[in-house]
Regions:
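C-terminal hydrophobic helical "lid"/dimerization subdomain
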Residues: 1, 248-252, 294-346
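Glycine-rich beta-strand-centered segment in the early N-terminal region that forms part
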Residues: 19-35, 48-94, 135-138
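Glycine-rich phosphate-binding loop and adjacent beta-alpha segment
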Residues: 244-307, 345-346
Length: 346
C-alpha cells in the first residue's frame, strides 16, 4: 500500500510503499476513502506523543470501507461503510465495562499507538467495540472530519458540558475543534461567543451560528469582553486551542458554577498552564477534559446530522491528495486557512 511515513521526529515525511496490513483476530482492515489532517497529527510528528514508535504512519480521522475481517469479529462484513473514534477501547477493562471506552486502560489510537490512516489501508483493533456504521447519506469526507475534532467537541459540549438551550458557551480558538463546538452548541440552542485572533476564522464562526465574536488580538481584555457579552460570564467555556493563555481565559470567563472543558491538547512546554484556582474554589467552577467519544455515543450525533441540525460538511475547507498531505501536516502549527482539510485522493 501507499502511505505517508516519517522515520525521525520533525523530519519531512515521505510517500512509501508498505505491505498491506492484515487484520488482527478481533479487528478489521479498512480501505481508507477519506482522512482528516489534524493538529494532533502534527503533535505526533514533532515528537510530543510518547506512544509513537518510529518509523511511523500518522493519521487518525478516517472513514472508509471494510476490506478484511478478523476471524473473531461478529458484527462487521467486507464492504461495510465505517468510521472509528480516534480513541478506541479494548472492550474488557473496567473503564470499557463502564462504557468509558475513550479512557480505556489499554486504548488503541490509530496514528499514535499504531500505524494510522495517512495510507490506502489501516488496521483497526477491537472492531466490534470501536467501529461505527455510516449512513449511506453521509459522504466519506464528511465522515472523516467527525473522527477527532467533531466528536471531541460533541462530547465536550453535550456530555461533559451538559449544555442546554439558552446558556452561554464561550469557545476559545476557532480551528476545526472550535468551529465544531460553535456548530454543536448553536444546534442545541445555546448562545455562542467565539474567540480567535483571525478575522477569517471569526467570520466562519458567525456563519456557523456564533451569536458574538471576540478578536483576542484587538481587545484589551478577553475575559472582560466575554463577561460583557454574556452579562456575567459563560455557563460553559471551551479551550479548543490548547495554549496556556486560552486555558486561563476560558476558566476566568466563567460565571459562578460554570464549567471549563479542556479540548485542545496541552503538550510539551504547554502541559502545565497557570490556573486561577482561587476563582475555581470561590465560584465552585468545574474543570473537565474531553478526550474523544465512545463509538456507542455516535448514534446521537449522527441522528442530528441526518435530521439537518448539524451540517459538518460546512467545516470542510480543502480536499487534497495523499501527496499534498505531507505539506499540510508539517504546516498544521501555522493555523493557515479555515475549516478542516481532508485527504480524498490516495
Amino acid at each position: 500500500m501507499k502511505a505517508v511515513v516519517f522515520e525521525q521526529f520533525s523530519a519531512p515525511p515521505h510517500i512509501q510503499q508498505l505491505p498491506d496490513p492484515a487484520p488482527e483476530s478481533h479487528g478489521v482492515v479498512v480501505k481508507v476513502m477519506a482522512n482528516g489532517v489534524c493538529r494532533s497529527d502534527w503533535h505526533g510528528w514533532v515528537g510530543h506523543d510518547t506512544d509513537i514508535q518510529l518509523p511511523h504512519v500518522p493519521g487518525h480521522e478516517l472513514a472508509g470501507v471494510v476490506e478484511a475481517v478478523g476471524k473473531d469479529v461478529k458484527q462487521w462484513r467486507i464492504g461495510d461503510r465505517v468510521t472509528v473514534p480516534f480513541v478506541g477501547g479494548c472492550g474488557s477493562c473496567p473503564e470499557c465495562h463502564a462504557g468509558n471506552h475513550q479512557v480505556c486502560d489499554s486504548q488503541f489510537q490509530p496514528g499514535f499507538t499504531h500505524w494510522g490512516s495517512f495510507a490506502e489501508y489501516v488496521s483497526i483493533h477491537y472492531a466490534d467495540v470501536n467501529l461505527v456504521a455510516l449512513p449511506e447519506t453521509l459522504d466519506f469526507a464528511t465522515a472523516a472530519s467527525l473522527g477527532c475534532r467533531f466528536v471531541t467537541s460533541f462530547r465536550a459540549v453535550v456530555d461533559q458540558g451538559q449544555t442546554s438551550a439558552g446558556q452561554w458557551v464561550a469557545v476559545h480558538g476557532c480551528g476545526g475543534v472550535g468551529l465544531s463546538a460553535v456548530m454543536i452548541a448553536n444546534a442545541i440552542g445555546a448562545n455562542v461567543v467565539a474567540i480567535d485572533i483571525s478575522e477569517k476564522a471569526l467570520a466562519l464562526a458567525r456563519q456557523l451560528g456564533a451569536t458574538a465574536t471576540v478578536n483576542a488580538a484587538k481587545v484589551a481584555n478577553v475575559v472582560e469582553a466575554v463577561a460583557d457579552i454574556t452579562r456575567g460570564g459563560a455557563h460553559v467555556s471551551l479551550d479548543a486551542l490548547g495554549h496556556p493563555t486560552t486555558c486561563f481565559n476560558s476558566i476566568s470567563n466563567l460565571r459562578k458554577r460554570g464549567k471549563h472543558i479542556q479540548v485542545g491538547l496541552m503538550l510539551a512546554e504547554n502541559s502545565t498552564p497557570a490556573i486561577p484556582m482561587s476563582q475555581v474554589i470561590a465560584n465552585e467552577l468545574e474543570i473537565l477534559g474531553s478526550h474523544g467519544m465512545q463509538a456507542h455515543r455516535y448514534g446521537a450525533m449522527l441522528a442530528m446530522i441526518q435530521s439537518g441540525k448539524l451540517a459538518p460538511e460546512q467545516l470542510i475547507g480543502r480536499r487534497i491528495t495523499l501527496e499534498q498531505s505531507i505539506e499540510a501536516l508539517m504546516n498544521m502549527d501555522k493555523f493557515e486557512g479555515a475549516g478542516v482539510t481532508v485527504v480524498t485522493a490516495f
